[in-house]
Amino acid sequence: MEPSKLFTMSDNATFAPGPVVNAADKKTFRTCFRILVLSVQAVTLILVIVTLGELVRMINDQGLSNQLSSIADKIRESATMIASAVGVMNQVIHGVTVSLPLQIEGNQNQLLSTLATIRTGKKQVSNCSTNIPLVNDLRFINGINKFIIEDYATHDFSIGHPLNMPSFIPTATSPNGCTRIPSFSLGKTHWCYTHNVINANCKDHTSSNQYISMGILVQTASGYPMFKTLKIQYLSDGLNRKSCSIATVPDGCAMYCYVSTQLETDDYAGSSPPTQKLTLLFYNDTVTERTISPTGLEGNWATLVPGVGSGIYFENKLIFPAYGGVLPNSTLGVKSAREFFRPVNPYNPCSGPQQDLDQRALRSYFPSYFSNRRVQSAFLVCAWNQILVTNCELVVPSNNQTLMGAEGRVLLINNRLLYYQRSTSWWPYELLYEISFTFTNSGQSSVNMSWIPIYSFTRPGSGNCSGENVCPTACVSGVYLDPWPLTPYSHQSGINRNFYFTGALLNSSTTRVNPTLYVSALNNLKVLAPYGNQGLFASYTTTTCFQDTGDASVYCVYIMELASNIVGEFQILPVLTRLTIT
């Protein structure tokens, strides 16, 4: 039945139907509804995705935080372990650099003390004592080759009167005799000494013998030390040894000499160096002598001369000072042709154009007196473990760091190396350098020199090279006067003025007279103590100081060549004094 078009109700109310909705309108409504539903679903999905993303991010952040926390914990653990390792490492460094050396030194001193109490009458096969051990008195062992002062403070000094002790240095026994060129070395266990005994006045190019002795420091009943001689060797074999340097070595002495029977000037004029001799003397009376030809000698040097001053035993090596004339066209001569060192005294400078002064300084290395050869300093270095096969080399410093070659001495104090160089050229002041070696197993070893500026006094000199001259010029003058440093030198600004040293100088600018004991700072003399009468002639002096660790007394032995009108031209005298430091 078809639907009714009219709805008729009671109460005579009639409802008329509204407009009929067609299909197109219905379709539009459904589309809008669906779009709305889809939009809501899309928004919901987006919100869900965003929410999930935020949840994931929060979860990840929490994981990263946990990871960072874990890493931080591990870093803290590592830092704790590193701190612990650093503490251990510091203890190791302190033990190796401080405690262990002190313990070794203490054990060494205890061992030496024990040896000093041993007496045996049985002849030993090794290089050891037969009766009295070759060991210094325990009071002195730890005060040898040590800086007496290490605080860099300002100090005052006084030099005591010479102490009366038996001389360990024999003198000439005839008016025509001559004893000259002393060389002295004091080691921790013993001392070594040598001088030349010239048969015809003091002309050392003729005929001479060599006196050598070794001994120990002992304490006398008066409380001060004495140099007790235990062994003597007198080399009288027809060889004219000259300019010998001595060094203490284990169980004995080592001596470096050269052999020549012509004038020194003739040696420089030649083209082949004279014979070089290395002599080893041990306490069991063993004497071994070798002719050596160190690496770098042949083809470079016209002559090579030992430095007279003592050498050292250092890091299993034997080191002696040397100097000589370099051949001009040799490898060494060409290499050093333009090298020179020109120190300046700021308190008394030399005036003139700098270029001219530099040229004069360069020419000073080639004195006409020595046939215009470059006069060069050097060091003879020998490996101790190969000493019997004389494996030696010449180590040559740069002339940009040293003045013209001359006699010298190598010092080892508190394990620091120093080099005294005689002021033979134009520079009138004491010449002292800090030195350091670089040794190589193959190839050429090297040495670095650092000049210590000393201006406190001058040596006597002749002609244009008197003690008053401070300008470069070519000359051969001066005299050997080595100092003994009492303090280490520091390059730190402001404290260098408290570098102190002692020795024996000749108080004249032109003549070798007036021997005087002194203590000096860099720029001024602290104490002067004249020895003998005014005008007394003297020559070479060498000084060594040490300490009695029992009562902290400081002693210095000043070995001086003094004029003698009775037994030869010179008498070598050891003057022992007590040095008071306040």
Swiss-Prot record:
Keyword list, A-Z: Disulfide bond, Glycoprotein, Hemagglutinin, Host cell membrane, Host membrane, Host-virus interaction, Hydrolase, Membrane, Signal-anchor, Transmembrane, Transmembrane helix, Viral attachment to host cell, Viral envelope protein, Virion, Virus entry into host cell
Superkingdom of source: Viruses
Reactions the enzyme catalyzes: Hydrolysis of alpha-(2->3)-, alpha-(2->6)-, alpha-(2->8)- glycosidic linkages of terminal sialic acid residues in oligosaccharides, glycoproteins, glycolipids, colominic acid and synthetic substrates
Cited Pfam families: HN (PF00423)
Sample GO molecular function, one term: host cell surface receptor binding
Glycosylation-annotated residues: N284, N329, N400, N448, N507
Alphabetized InterPro entries for the sequence: Hemagglutn-neuramid, Hemagglutn/HN, Sialidase_sf
Primary enzyme class: hydrolase
Disulfide bonds: C178-C202, C192-C253, C244-C257, C350-C471, C382-C392, C465-C475, C545-C556
Main localization (coarse): virion
Virion surface side: 56-582
Residues in compartment: Intravirion: 1-34
Domain notes: The C-terminus (head domain) is involved in binding the cellular receptor.
Function field: Attaches the virus to alpha-2,3-linked sialic acid-containing cell receptors and thereby initiating infection. Binding of HN protein to the receptor induces a conformational change that allows the F protein to trigger virion/cell membranes fusion. Binds to the glycan motifs sialyl Lewis (SLe) and GM2 ganglioside (GM2-glycan).
Record-given protein name: Hemagglutinin-neuraminidase
Species assigned in the record: Mumps orthorubulavirus
Gene transcribed to yield this protein: HN
